[in-house]
């Protein structure tokens, strides 16, 4: 039987349970009195009179600053970040007036697609800049209410938490003997969340009718995909500011149920694993998840959901870019291929920049990637370093107008050995991993 206690490392991962110590809340939106009410509870367990906070010019201005920092493409109205910035004061005044008068209506969401490793594409919804600002204001007002309830098993898109925290929790569970893992995949989660059930979750906490109506309008905003336009019957678009918060809210019930049953779940948005001590427990955990998903009108992907003992070869699981198998962490193939695609884009043979300029362009990307994947097994890194150097040697050969011929690789290596690139400041993961592995 699973243990009924929440893992100690998960408890510690919650930065603080006193909202008055939260540094990420907007003081102009959430006063000390409101934060204290989170702890003490509000009458009827629901929050009223939030609309004025959403419409407040200060809230909208703070939201605009966040939208401007994140950049992003224009929505269906064609208004870019730069164009909005040129007339920001006027646009914000109009937005305040429209919200207060009840005139604001969400525009259609422009759908685009971003490539995924393997040739698949992920749909992305791009709201207008104005809608991003209003959604950001809603998020600033609602997030503390939801965050107060969210459990330590959830790590994605939450203040002060992230993928590295989730991975540390997985490592701790594996070291504690939880080797049987349920690797679950929700099929099209962001596009399939039932609107009515999601709004029920919101209404269980919020009673401000205008806030609820605005949220509902955003969920039902038309989607424009090329020449096609339709009204969605479910889902919350990936790319919308408010979507991650709502997606976490809908899966909060799963966190609660699995924890109450004593299962060790680690969730990052819609990606989650359940770590168990034996196969029997894992099978029971999977049945529990399947039942919960059926009740909540969600679907587990049959081909991507499985159970295995991750100590065995071929029975590992993938989570947040890593593959856990045979007692080690490996870089997921898709993550490795995605990095190589980025390296190729920066090292095209017809690139006319100097070697110093190319290395200066490569290094921040390589350092950032290593910073995340440095806990992978050491054999992952030499092949990546070698791939980078081969790309650079091909550029140098072209700069010298040398033709490629049989045996060229060995000649290139002799002409430009590894030490040559080290002298030019190229970041190498093998060296960085060796340094990071030294005892301190």
Tell me what each language-model feature is.
Residues 1-440:
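Non-catalytic terminal/accessory segments
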